[in-house]
Regions:
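Walker A (P-loop) phosphate-binding motif
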Residues: 116-140
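Long, basic/Gly/Ser/Thr-rich N-terminal segments
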Residues: 1-107
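Low-complexity, flexible helical/coil segments
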Residues: 40-43, 114-120
Length: 140
């Protein structure tokens, strides 16, 4: 699966490189890394050296930069390796919405959002269970 990784400067570049190589070992083809902010662990020049993975700058406009990267690189998914405080949950969901609107999955540690299915509806009845609470399938 071809992915664009979201990274930040709040992690040491060595750790980010390890995360990218682990992603590659898990079957992801990392096309590029999009830097979404943070510079705590970067050098004076704020350079983010991720080896063979090209780094795209998205600190000023992460949503626009992600949209452009998805369109240009034709990624299948966005792999979120960033963390707070660089990306708040609100900002993370905005980036997920950008990816999903362009037909890309949004993947992170312990979660995956897939874009809506745009195929024609099935010709047979279907059922869905949503909004279940803690008392589902229990007797009271």
């Amino acid at each position: 699966m071809k992915v664009i990784a979201l990274v930040d400067g709040e992690h040491y570049p060595e750790v980010t490189r390890w995360g990218l190589s682990s992603a590659a070992a898990s079957g992801y083809d990392v096309l590029a890394a999009l830097a979404v902010g943070g510079a705590e662990k970067l050098d004076r020049e704020r350079a983010l050296d991720l080896g063979r993975v090209p780094v795209l700058r998205g600190e000023v406009d992460p949503m626009g930069a992600l949209a452009a990267a998805i369109d240009e690189l034709r990624a299948d998914a966005v792999l979120d390796l960033s963390d707070e405080p660089v990306l708040s949950y609100e900002r993370r969901m905005e980036l997920a919405a950008v990816a999903l609107a362009r037909g890309c999955a949004y993947v992170g540690p312990g979660f995956r959002f897939d874009p809506p299915v745009r195929d024609a509806p099935l010709r047979v009845p279907t059922a869905a269970v949503i909004g279940t609470g803690k008392r589902v399938a229990k007797t009271s």
